[in-house]
């Protein structure tokens, strides 16, 4: 958490916590505490809420995802939150299909190997099919529906769905069209 505060403080440009969430809602180490979010927001940056059930906590589904958006937007403003998926769509038969492809060389360590042994990510309950599918990219239009249902304006929805990250990218990389 302190590294996030330090990075935002010393940066001359806005920073992004791209694949995160609100620590107040889940307590996962990948999520940012309010002090970190404040440092990022004060610098003009944004926090990207990820689509990983174990990081989101709560119901671990699209509602938990929207809860993180609500928390950050309510506490820090709609300019402070964006989508930071941290995952691609994985079809239900992915593992079966991957077994058909011969392995070449040594396997790399999966990112989960870097987390503490008691990390929620390792708990099988977060691999529930309902949770996974509700956060699948095929359901991303439902993020918009959910934000409409929760009372966000069209302008705020556009910011959250990509406007905020584009704003930061344009400020950080002004010479790129």
Enumerate the language-model features and the residues they cover.
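Conserved, mostly hydrophobic/aromatic
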Residues: 19, 40, 47, 86, ...
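Short glycine/threonine-rich loop-to-helix capping motif typified by GTGT followed
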Residues: 61, 92-98, 169-177
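Histidine/acidic residue-rich metal-binding segments in metalloenzymes
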Residues: 1-16, 29-45, 63-79
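Active-site beta-loop-alpha junctions enriched in small/polar residues
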Residues: 1-2, 20-23, 52-54, 86-90
